[in-house]
Structures are given as C-alpha cells and as structure tokens.
Amino acid sequence: MASTGLELLGMTLAVLGWLGTLVSCALPLWKVTAFIGNSIVVAQVVWEGLWMSCVVQSTGQMQCKVYDSLLALPQDLQAARALCVIALLLALLGLLVAITGAQCTTCVEDEGAKARIVLTAGVILLLAGILVLIPVCWTAHAIIQDFYNPLVAEALKRELGASLYLGWAAAALLMLGGGLLCCTCPPPQVERPRGPRLGYSIPSRSGASGLDKRDYV
C-alpha cells in the first residue's frame, strides 16, 4: 500500500510539473521590461517569450506578435524552444509509462516487470525536469548578465518574468515526482547461501570383518 501511495503521489506531482512546463513555455513572460530610474510610469511594457512578444500600453491595450521567422531568432531562443518541446514530450512519455506499470493498473501482471517499468518512468521524468531546468537557468543567467552590463542601454534591459519562476517550480515537481517513482522500485532480493547439510555416515566395517576372517583361517 505504501508503494502504491508513493506512485500516485509521484504521478500527481509529475502531472502538475507537466502542466506547469506547458504554461511556462506558452506564456510570453520570460523577459519583461526592467523599471530602471526614477520614473515609475512608462508608456509601454514589453513581454518576451519563446513564441511571441507582447507590448502592453499604459492604457491597458495589449498587442502580441508571433515570431515569424525561425532562422532569424537568436540561437539561445531556438535552443530553449527545442529543449522545452523535448521536455514536454519526455514528461508525457514518462507519465504514460508510469501509468502502464503502476500497481493500480492491470496492464502488466508481473510484479518485477511493473517495478522495472515504474523505475524507467521515474528516470524519464528526472531527465525531463533537467531539460526544463536548462533553458530556464540559461535565460535567467543571460537576463542578469545584461542587466548589470553597463554597455547595454536601459531601454533594452529586462527582468526575470513569471514564466521563469513557473519553469523552476515545474522542473522541481517533475524531478520530485520522478524521484518518488524511482523510490517505489523494490530492492533486488538476494538469496542467502545455504550451509552444508549435516548428516551422519555409518563407517564401513568391511575391513574389520575381513581381518577377522583371515585370523580364523
């Protein structure tokens, strides 16, 4: 029962992590306008994401534009896109594999095979969490580096958006769920070596009987 509870908890965390990754990759809130200087009121706020950028006017009107050309995008943005898509597919595959080998399903009857399937699902989810973590940390490092770079104009400086924080949380949920699934795998049973069987052997008396017969001859 404890193993089943850990599996359900791990799969629940993995589902939440997958949904968080999907929302983080879809929202254009990876980079937002940095409020630098004494003036708080600005004419517009810029949001930048993996797939589009949005401009929010001071009146509340928002205009979004999807990136048209893939080749015109920076290489770091292309890599972040690819890693996020691969992470989403891997996490979905890990969830399907976990459902197949879960204790509460009857897709596989063998208990040993179920344990190996759940362990595989946990490893896949751990890998998906790492793939989510790479573009999020990469983008955050680039934003912080440009923010403190005196050569970058203040109008071009950005701050960390909400999608980055959501991406960190989603990666943590995926890795935590994958770790719980790996912990549900039972340890291999080691057979204890059997000791030598103790028995009693009756000594042969043929030699003694032969000597006795020769003595009488």
Curated annotation (Swiss-Prot):
Side of membrane Extracellular, spans: 29-81, 138-159
Stretches the record annotates as Disordered: 194-217
Cytoplasmic side: 1-7, 103-116, 181-217
Reported tissue expression: Expressed in the liver, in peripheral blood mononuclear cells and hepatocarcinoma cell lines.
Annotated localization: Cell junction, Tight junction; Cell membrane
Lineage: superkingdom: Eukaryota
GO molecular function, one term: identical protein binding
GO terms for cellular component: bicellular tight junction; cell junction; intracellular membrane-bounded organelle; plasma membrane
Keyword terms: Cell junction, Cell membrane, Deafness, Host cell receptor for virus entry, Host-virus interaction, Membrane, Non-syndromic deafness, Receptor, Tight junction, Transmembrane, Transmembrane helix
Family per record: Belongs to the claudin family.
Protein's name according to its UniProt entry: Claudin-9
Source organism (scientific name): Homo sapiens
Lineage, broadest ranks: Eukaryota, Metazoa, Chordata, Craniata, Vertebrata
